Design a protein with these regions (language model features):
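Signature of multi-pass transmembrane helix bundles
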Residues: 1-39, 45-228
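Membrane-interface interhelical connector segments
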Residues: 236-259
Length: 259
């Protein structure tokens, strides 16, 4: 046992800390902390609605939940790219890249325009789409990161600075939205359905007793070695949010919670 503890503290823990210090992993962990107030805001309204079901004179605050918890995937897509640009040292792209991440997310949701009305499945922009938000946010961050490494017009002396900034934003924006268009509109692929299919085994496994124990036990083990449990939120938060969203929908339809 002493040998195992020595190996964990002297060999495994330093290597694990180095892995979790990776800016891409740290980006996801940081995003989960950023969106927590939004999650709690929606949760507070759901808790309030429990009392409202008995005290019917209370006002309906559901719009607050719909535009906080109900837009969680969009917020995640924004914050993933925002945090990545910050941690990778590309502050000049921080806002534009984050906004394009939202645009790419909406495009990849494959919305429909019916009689001039923009329609999108509400479930895709809420908690159920959080994994897609992470993937899209990382995709946009990678495109902007790779472009930033080219240092285009960095030593330019002829063009005004604002023109150089325009060009350096137009190119990665066009590439990002172009690739999203090819995926969603040309190839007709549904990223949401693809990720749900890939994520479902993990989601179902987490609902079992062994899965639940692992979700609770693994972060505790790493925390004992000085590694913050926040780094595991990239995996656990999507699982929890999808399960919570399913429970909310089930109760709203008059059924018992399933998770």
């Amino acid at each position: 046992m002493d040998g195992l503890m020595k190996w964990l503290s002297d060999v495994f823990a330093p290597k694990a800390r180095k892995v979790f210090a990776n800016p891409w992993i740290d980006t996801v962990a940081s995003t989960m902390k950023k969106v927590l107030p939004i999650i709690l805001t929606g949760s507070l309204i759901f808790f309030y609605n429990v009392f409202r079901s008995y005290l019917t004179f209370l006002p309906d605050l559901s719009p607050i939940a719909n535009f906080s918890f109900g837009l969680l995937a969009i917020f995640v897509a924004f914050f993933i790219t925002h945090e990545a640009m910050l941690k990778l040292g590309h502050g000049e792209y921080q806002i534009n890249a984050s906004l394009i991440s939202v645009a790419s997310y909406l495009m990849l949701c494959r919305p429909q325009v019916v009689d001039g009305v923009f329609q999108i499945d509400n479930g895709r922009i809420g908690a159920a789409g959080i994994m897609m938000g992470i993937v899209v946010g990382l995709f946009v961050a990678i495109v902007f990161h790779l472009y930033a490494k080219l240092h285009v017009l960095e030593n330019n002396d002829t063009l005004p600075d604002f023109v150089s900034d325009w060009i350096n934003n137009i190119i990665p924006i066009t590439i990002t939205l172009g690739l999203s268009m090819i995926f969603a509109n040309v190839l007709k692929l549904d990223l949401y359905d693809i990720l749900v299919s890939l994520f479902m085994p993990l989601q179902k496994g987490a609902q079992t007793l062994p899965g639940f124990i692992l979700i609770c036990f693994v972060p505790v083990i790493f925390y004992s070695m000085g590694i913050s449990s926040w780094v595991f939120n990239a995996v656990t938060t999507p699982i929890f949010m999808v399960a919570i969203a399913e429970n909310i929908e089930a109760v709203a339809n008059g059924h018992a919670p399933m998770n």
